[in-house]
Amino acid sequence: MKRIAYRFFLIVLLSVLAVEVFPVSAQEGSWFDEGNYDEEWLDKNFDNDVMIISTPEEFAAFGEYMTSSLWNYPNKTVRLAADMDMSAHKWITPVNEQFGSYFSGVFDGDGHKISGLTVVPAEEGEGYDYKRVVAGLFGTVRNAEIRD
């Protein structure tokens, strides 16, 4: 009986260690895929001078709208209200067909950190021009202020 209990304990222990040593990657899809970002965030914050981001889904909504439109958050402060763990999905920088989007507001991290962010440029396809592809948290910034 002791031998069975010992084997059971050993199997459980090795299983726990395997999960800790070899974590399972949950990075499937993009933060910009429908359902991965908070579609209501912009509507709730559009008229505010300071736009507060409290969740990774809200952060993704900020990024999705910034990279998919020509609106560049002028005269707006975008402030983090919490640390952002962005490891659930990849930050796939979409190809903006106009190549005119950029961030021009104030991004205030307010002492919070963004972790687990995997930035991936968009795949080749319609509208892709390797000479003009930008990839990053903002893609392009112009007359912007970035604070920690």
For each predicted feature, which ranges?
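Surface-exposed repetitive/solenoidal architectures
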Residues: 26-148
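C-terminal segment of classical bacterial N-terminal signal peptides
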Residues: 15-25
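Bacterial N-terminal signal peptides that target proteins for export
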Residues: 1-9
